[in-house]
């Protein structure tokens, strides 16, 4: 077999293996993220206590999804990148981080993995699936699109700047990405359910029979967010953002700020020396002025004697 053809088949094999693991990772991520949300709803339904307040639900849902992503992404970070999101995959395709074949395979894996994760949650719990992304009352489709666009752009940018960009903090990228998901949920879960991920919205919708008539919002908004986040990242790269703060991502201790106490002491000594020098200059100027005045008086006296004529 021709070496180039053999290399192509090797790449396809690797892409298929990575996509298979991305399927598992997506199902794993949504199993625990959606499972936590489902448990919260079931608890409110079964409990005789008053239901939890809205803010408690928002915090619980945000924590479930954010921490599930931290754990899942960290487990799969060195295997597939831990994307679990076709919108992230699309952004990486736009900036050259994914090749077209792997992008297509990853999208298929992420969508089917989301269906599998939602199906497992539904099969393991007795209550109807209550984890669908829906527009809350008072939230229009246009508002939903823009909310999803902006929060997806934030998530995309966190992935590109923390994981795609290589620097000292790259191994800890899953933490930053998970916290970004957590923060975006705090804002948007009350309005749109905070998908930021077309697969996360698609999986439960398939299992539940698409209860949200405006389901298209969770495709248009996140993919617009991918374009926005990737475009902003590309602009930063084009203008070489690292020149603005070149020593920020280094571990060289010599790039740290100087000893503040020594700097303060040096500054104080400089001011004292400047003050002493000004004082000396002032004294010298006064002495020169006195001498000049004395010389002028002597000159005037001599001139008076010279011009004096006896009568």
From Swiss-Prot:
Described function: Water channel required to facilitate the transport of water across membranes. Also mediates the transport nitric oxide, hydrogen peroxide and carbon dioxide across the membrane. Required for Hartig net development in trembling aspen trees. Contributes in fungal cellular processes during the basidiocarp formation.
Lineage: superkingdom: Eukaryota
One Gene Ontology term of the molecular function aspect: water channel activity
UniProt keywords, alphabetically: Cell membrane, Glycoprotein, Membrane, Repeat, Transmembrane, Transmembrane helix, Transport
Gene: AQP1
Compartment annotation: Cell membrane
GO annotation, cellular component aspect: plasma membrane
Protein name: Aquaporin-1
Induction trigger: Expression is 700-fold higher in the hyphae within the root than in the free-living mycelium after 24h of direct interaction with the roots. Expression is low in vegetative mycelia and highly up-regulated during development of the basidiocarp.
Organism: Laccaria bicolor (Bicoloured deceiver)
Knockout-associated phenotype: Impairs the mycorrhizal structure development.
